[in-house]
């Protein structure tokens, strides 16, 4: 009798252990990850990318990954969210690349003037397999990497005084999207005083005349209604705002191979919005600006040529200061020629 009772107890223990193992496996398989995405912009191509990305990831992961998108700097200003990704408190942030140089100086290369002819041309260059591979590990030493690098839109300058050519920049205090020489020196060459200011702080600075003008993507300026503060907005020749969606590398690995692959694949799929929806949105933004009483200025050909000559003239010493950035720039120039 005692032997039979012992066998029953052992059998029950084995069943319990098996059930516990099954429960642990099921729990691991059902584990849900939350991917918080921070963006400083609203109602632009970044938001459209996030919408497509969210739908694809949540559907393919069968609910194992929940994507939460926070536009308009809801999770904090750009420097704080970039630090948050590096520390692992935020899974993803999508700033202009100029705000990532503190983590990885190579990010500045994307903002070299004259690289891209149009948004579509720029997306072809950034989507080139060799270019993707070259920049896949940017920031790895600081625990981040770019999940997506894209053209947010044409770079514009909104200003209290209309900008029709290089001479109009002289003595103007201009907000630029980054503090590195790549952003600062071109405007110094034009006689301006460039200041790096996070996007969330630019509107009040322009309103109270702390700055005379601000450089940003066209859709951003329209979405935040800058036309209520300053009417003239000028296309900067051969210049586009490049942004990057950086993710925490440790978090990506924590997903496991299958879910990590889903995130990467859906990010690339969603990039199609930049070449279609994003291009159309840039046109809509210009139309809206004019409808709201703003002025959209395109420099005359001779002025545009002089502008590019001035701003590109400062590039050689900047590139020479960092051999890796110089090599990256050469690779982008070669890819740009390939897709012309």
Model regions: which residues?
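An acidic, glycine-rich surface segment that forms the CoA-thioester-binding/catalytic face
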Residues: 126
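N-terminal secretory/targeting leader peptides
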Residues: 31-122, 130-340
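Bacterial N-terminal signal peptides
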Residues: 11-24
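Boundary at the C-terminal end of the N-terminal hydrophobic targeting segment
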Residues: 23-24, 28-32
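Intrinsically disordered, low-complexity segments enriched in small/polar residues
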Residues: 4, 16-19, 61, 291-292
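N-terminal secretory signal peptides that target proteins for export/translocation
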Residues: 1-7
């Amino acid at each position: 009798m005692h032997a039979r009772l012992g066998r029953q107890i052992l059998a029950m223990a084995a069943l319990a252990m098996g059930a516990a193992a099954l429960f642990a496996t099921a729990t691991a398989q059902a584990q849900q990850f939350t991917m918080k995405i921070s963006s400083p912009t609203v109602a632009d191509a970044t938001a459209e990318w996030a919408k497509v990305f969210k739908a694809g990831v949540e559907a393919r992961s069968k609910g194992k990954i929940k994507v939460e998108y926070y536009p308009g700097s809801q999770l904090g200003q750009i420097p704080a969210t970039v630090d948050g990704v590096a520390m692992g408190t935020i899974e993803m942030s999508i700033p202009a690349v100029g705000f990532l140089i503190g983590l990885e100086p190579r990010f500045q290369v994307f903002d070299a003037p004259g690289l891209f002819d149009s948004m579509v041309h720029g997306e072809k260059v950034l989507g080139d397999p060799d270019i993707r591979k070259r920049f896949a590990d940017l920031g790895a030493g600081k625990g981040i990497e770019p999940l997506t690098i894209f053209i947010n839109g044409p770079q514009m300058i909104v200003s209290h005084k209309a900008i029709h050519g290089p001479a109009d920049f002289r003595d103007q205090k201009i907000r630029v999207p980054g503090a590195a020489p790549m952003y600062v020196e071109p405007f110094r060459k034009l006689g301006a005083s460039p200041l790096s200011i996070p996007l969330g702080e630019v509107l009040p600075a322009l309103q109270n005349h702390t700055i005379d003008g601000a450089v940003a993507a066209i859709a951003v300026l329209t979405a935040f209604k800058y036309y209520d503060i300053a009417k003239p907005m000028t296309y900067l020749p051969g210049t586009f705002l490049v942004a990057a969606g950086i993710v925490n590398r440790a978090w990506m690995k924590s997903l496991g191979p299958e879910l990590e692959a889903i995130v990467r694949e859906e990010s690339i799929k969603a990039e199609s919005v930049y070449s279609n929806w994003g291009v159309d949105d840039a046109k809509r933004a210009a139309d809206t600006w004019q409808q709201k009483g703003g002025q959209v200025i395109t420099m005359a050909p001779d002025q545009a040529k002089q502008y590019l000559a001035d701003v590109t003239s400062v590039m050689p010493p900047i590139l020479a200061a960092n051999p890796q950035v110089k090599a990256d720039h050469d690779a982008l120039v070669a890819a740009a020629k390939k897709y012309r």
